[in-house]
Design a protein with these regions (language model features):
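Divalent metal-binding pocket/active-site signature
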Residues: 2-12, 17-28, 44-45, 74-76, ...
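His/Asp/Glu-enriched short active-site or ligand-binding loop at hydrolase and phosphoryl-transfer sites
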Residues: 170-182
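Aromatic/hydrophobic pocket-lining residues that form π-stacking "cages" and hydrophobic walls in ligand
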Residues: 50, 116, 224
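Conserved beta/loop motifs at nucleotide-recognition and modification sites
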Residues: 204
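Flexible, gly/pro- and Lys/Arg-enriched active-site loops
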Residues: 181-182, 200, 216
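A metal-dependent hydrolase metal-coordination microenvironment
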Residues: 29-80
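Single conserved hydrophobic/aromatic residue that forms the stacking wall/gate
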Residues: 222, 226-233
Length: 233
C-alpha cells in the first residue's frame, strides 16, 4: 500500500459538522472514513436536533448545546431551555464572539459567551468557541475564567501571533476548509505553530467547502486534512 492509499484510508474525527442543515438523507457512505464526529447546536432548536441525530447514527457521535453569537440577543428567551440541554449535552457551544458581522451587539455577545463559559466550568464539559475578529476579547475572557474546561477554537483563522498567544492557554485549534483557500497563507503557516496533540480537523458541514469541492455540500475531511498533514511532515 502506498502513502497516498494509506492516507485516504485513515479514520478521521470531524469536530464540527452541522448535520441538521443538510438537505439530504445521510447513509453510512458519508461516514466511512469517520471515527467519530461532533454535531454542534447554535440555538435551542438546532441543539435538540443535534441530540436527535446523534442518537440515530451508527457512527460514534457527540452533540453540543449552545447559542451562536449571531443570536446572542435571544439569550433571555432561550436561557432556561439551554440550561437543561447543557446538562444532557456532551459539549457546550457553539458560542463565542463574532465582531465581523455584529448581528447581536458586543454586549449581548459577551453576556452570552460568559453564560456558556460558566456552565462549561460548572459542568466540566468542553466548550466550542466561535472567534471571528475578536481574538483579544476571546483571549481575555478565557484568561479571566482560567480556561473553564477543554476549549476548542472552532474554524481557527488566527495568524501566527494569535496562534502563539492561544497556545499559552492549552486550547485546541480546529482547522476547517478555509486552510485550503489561496487567501489563507497566514493560516497555513500558523498550522505549523500548533502542536499535533492540539490540532483538530472539522468540515463545518455544510459550510466552508474546500476549494476543490466549491459549490457542493461540504462532507470531505480528506481535502482539509491533506494540506494540514503536509504542514506537519
Amino acid at each position: 500500500m502506498n502513502k497516498s492509499q494509506s492516507f485516504m484510508e485513515i479514520k478521521w474525527v470531524d469536530t464540527h459538522c452541522h448535520l441538521q442543515l443538510l438537505n439530504k438523507n445521510l447513509d453510512e457512505n458519508h461516514f466511512k472514513n469517520i471515527e467519530f464526529l461532533v454535531i454542534p447546536g447554535v440555538d435551542v432548536e438546532s441543539s435538540s436536533k443535534a441530540k436527535e441525530i446523534s442518537s440515530s447514527l451508527e457512527v460514534e457521535s457527540y452533540w453540543s448545546a449552545g447559542l451562536h453569537p449571531h443570536d446572542a440577543k435571544l439569550l433571555d428567551t432561550q436561557r432556561h431551555d439551554l440550561e437543561k440541554l447543557f446538562v444532557e449535552a456532551d459539549l457546550i457551544g457553539e458560542t463565542g464572539l463574532d465582531f465581523y458581522r455584529n448581528l447581536s451587539t458586543k454586549e449581548e455577545q459577551r453576556e452570552n459567551f460568559l453564560f456558556h463559559l460558566e456552565f462549561s466550568k460548572q459542568l466540566n464539559k468542553p466548550i466550542i468557541i466561535h472567534c471571528r475578529d475578536s481574538f483579544q476579547d476571546t483571549y481575555d475572557l478565557l484568561v479571566e475564567f482560567n480556561n473553564p474546561s477543554s476549549v476548542i477554537l472552532h474554524s481557527w483563522t488566527g495568524g501566527r501571533k494569535w496562534t502563539k498567544r492561544f497556545r499559552e492557554l492549552d486550547v485546541y485549534f480546529s482547522i476547517s476548509g478555509i486552510v485550503t483557500y489561496e487567501t489563507a497563507k497566514d493560516l497555513q503557516l500558523s498550522v505549523q505553530e500548533i502542536p499535533i496533540n492540539r490540532l483538530l480537523l472539522e468540515t463545518d458541514t455544510p459550510y466552508l467547502t474546500p476549494m476543490p469541492l466549491k459549490g457542493q455540500d461540504n462532507l470531505s475531511l480528506i481535502h482539509i486534512s491533506e494540506p494540514t498533514r503536509r504542514r506537519h511532515i
